[in-house]
C-alpha cells in the first residue's frame, strides 16, 4: 500500500504516545516465565509484540487477550513446542526466545520472514554453548532458522557487545531459572539502554541483576507475577515529535515519562538542538516549533532506531547533519544506513554514507520513496512529506510497531492517506 503525505503545517493538539514495543516484549516473556498470574496493562498490540505473545503460547503458556494481557506464568516449566515457531519480522522475539528455548526440553525451531532470516545470530549461539545449550543455524551460516536443544544449566560465558544488545538481554532473561549465570561483555557495549530496560523489567518481577566491571551476574531466583503497566515508546514518539519539529506547531505528547530508561528519549535533546522548543513534564512532553531547523552532529550509539528519524530531519534542516556511532544499524530490518541514504538521494539530498553513519546536506524535495519493508523508514519519511509532499511505497509495514500511526499523526493535523 502507498502512504501519501501532503504538505501540512501548524500542527496542534494532544496525542498519546503508543506503548513501548521494547517493554511489551520483555514484560510478556518474563511474565510467561514467572510464578503466578501477571496482568500486562496497556501492551503494544502490533505484529512484533504479538510474535512474542504467540511464541510464549507455543511453549504452553496461557495468555488471555483483552485491553490487558493476562499471562498465566509457567514458573519456568516450559512445554516443547508442537511445531516450528514462526516469528514474522520480529528480531527482538527471535533473540530473546532463543535463550528461553534453552529452558524447554527437546528441540525448538525458530524462524521468520525473509528479512528475519538475514539477522546475525552466531554470537548468541556461541555464548549459549558454555551454559549447556546446543543451538545452531539450520543452514550453518549463523542466520535463522535457529535450532535450539534444551539444557540451559547456567555457568559463565562471554559475548560480543558490538552486534546486538539483544543477545545479552536474551541470556539475562533466562538466567534466573538456571544454577546462575555470569555474562562478560567483550568489546564495545552498544545500545546499553536496551539492556537497562531488560534489567528494569527483571527487577520489577523480583529478580535482581548485578553488573560490575563488564560482567553481569544473575543468581538462581524466581520471577513473581505482578500487574505491570507498559510505559510510552520514545522510538515511536520520535515521529510525532519530529513531525512538529519539521512542520511547525505546538503539540502535547502524553505517556512519555521523564525518568524512562529508554535510550531513544535522546530524540528530545536532538530536536531541541535543531531548533524546536521542548518542555518536559513528569509524564508528558510539549513540542513547539517554527519548522525552521538547523543541522546537528549526533552519536546514536545507544539509540540506533532513531537513525531514520534524525536522517530525514537533517534532510529538512539548514546546513550539515552528521550521524555516527550506528554501524550496528546495518543489521536491522534492512541495512538502515544504506537504505536511508538511497531513499534520501531519490529526493535530491546530498548524502555521504559512512561505515557507522552518514553526512547529510539539507535540501530535500518531494517525490516517491520505498520502505524496503522497514517500518522505521516508512514512518520517518512521512516527515519530509509534511514539508514537501511525498508518497511512500509499501508503507503498510508501519503495523509492525505502530499500527495506528496514520491516525495518531492525523490527530495532530498531518494530512495523509493510505491507499
From Swiss-Prot:
Record's protein name: 3-phosphoshikimate 1-carboxyvinyltransferase
Disulfide pairings: none
One Gene Ontology cellular component annotation held by this UniProt entry: cytoplasm
Compartment list: Cytoplasm
GO molecular function: 3-phosphoshikimate 1-carboxyvinyltransferase activity
Binding site for 3-phosphoshikimate: 21-22, 26, 164-166, 191, 305, 332
Family: Belongs to the EPSP synthase family.
Catalytic activity: 3-phosphoshikimate + phosphoenolpyruvate = 5-O-(1-carboxyvinyl)-3-phosphoshikimate + phosphate
Lineage: Archaea, Methanobacteriati, Methanobacteriota, Methanomada group, Methanobacteria
Subunit structure and binding partners: Monomer.
Active site: 305
Annotated binding of phosphoenolpyruvate, by residue: 21, 91, 119, 166, 336, 376
Keyword vocabulary terms for this entry: Amino-acid biosynthesis, Aromatic amino acid biosynthesis, Cytoplasm, Transferase
Known pathway: Metabolic intermediate biosynthesis; chorismate biosynthesis
Main localization category: cytoplasm
InterPro entries linked to this entry: Enolpyruvate_Tfrase_dom (IPR001986), Enolpyruvate_Tfrase_sf (IPR036968), EPSP_synthase (IPR006264), EPSP_synthase_CS (IPR023193), RNA3'P_cycl/enolpyr_Trfase_a/b (IPR013792)
EC number: 2.5.1.19
A Pfam family annotated for this UniProt entry: EPSP_synthase
Primary role: Catalyzes the transfer of the enolpyruvyl moiety of phosphoenolpyruvate (PEP) to the 5-hydroxyl of shikimate-3-phosphate (S3P) to produce enolpyruvyl shikimate-3-phosphate and inorganic phosphate.
GO biological process per UniProt: amino acid biosynthetic process; aromatic amino acid family biosynthetic process; chorismate biosynthetic process
